[in-house]
């Protein structure tokens, strides 16, 4: 017998769908989610395309542009659904921006952003296999450390 569990829909907030499988906890950790906000987390669920995905539903959360960019860096195929009064009022796919400001930490210990507390700035050189370059020290970064 197949049992299907239903998750109560949210009234007002954000649903992040199509998160790359096993990355929802990383997305959750990056967002500044208030402890009083109800959160539903679904890991490794089947998608209509036959692959596995994660889903994150947060009641009462409005994402900033920086939040959306962080999500794009962790899971570039994620979809954001904005919910108001139980209805989807906006739906869009995240996209990796051409410039990344203040989100990623430069891995060069001698970079001015690490020595003098200047906000980091990166240029995205390649999006398919993410390759970014620090605007200050010109170092290419392939392992991304995202600032909270």
Swiss-Prot record:
The GO molecular function terms of this record are:
metal ion binding
Q: How is the cofactor bound?
A: Binds 1 zinc ion per subunit.
Q: Which UniProt keywords apply?
A: Metal-binding, Pyrimidine biosynthesis, Zinc
- Biological processes, Gene Ontology terms: 'de novo' pyrimidine nucleobase biosynthetic process; pyrimidine nucleotide biosynthetic process
Chain segments annotated as coiled-coil in the UniProt record: none
Signal peptide start and end residues? none
| Subunit (UniProt) | Contains catalytic and regulatory chains.
Q: According to its UniProt record, which protein family does this protein belong to?
A: Belongs to the PyrI family.
Gene name as annotated: pyrI
The cofactors required by this protein are: Zn(2+)
What does this protein do, in the record's words?
Involved in allosteric regulation of aspartate carbamoyltransferase.
Gene3D superfamilies in alphabetical order: Aspartate carbamoyltransferase regulatory subunit, C-terminal domain, Aspartate carbamoyltransferase regulatory subunit, N-terminal domain
Reading the lineage from the top rank, the first entry is Archaea
Might you report a single GO cellular component term? aspartate carbamoyltransferase complex
Give the matching Pfam families. Answer: PyrI, PyrI_C
NCBIfam families recorded: ATCase_reg
- UniProt binding sites for Zn(2+): 106, 111, 134, 137
Protein's recorded name: Aspartate carbamoyltransferase regulatory chain
């Amino acid at each position: 017998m197949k049992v299907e569990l239903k998750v109560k829909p949210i009234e007002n907030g954000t649903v992040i769908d199509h998160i790359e499988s096993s990355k929802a906890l990383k997305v959750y950790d990056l967002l500044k989610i208030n402890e009083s906000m109800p959160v539903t987390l679904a890991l490794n669920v089947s998608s209509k395309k036959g692959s596995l995905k994660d889903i994150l539903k947060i009641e009462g959360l409005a994402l900033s542009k920086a939040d959306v960019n962080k999500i794009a860096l962790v899971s570039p195929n994620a979809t954001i659904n904005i919910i108001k009064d139980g209805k989807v009022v906006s739906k869009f796919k995240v996209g990796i921006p051409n410039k990344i400001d203040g989100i990623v930490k430069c891995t060069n210990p001698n970079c001015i952003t690490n020595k003098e507390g200047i906000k980091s700035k990166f240029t995205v050189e390649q999006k398919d296999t993410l390759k970014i370059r620090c605007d200050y020290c010109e170092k290419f970064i392939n392992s991304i450390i995202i600032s909270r």
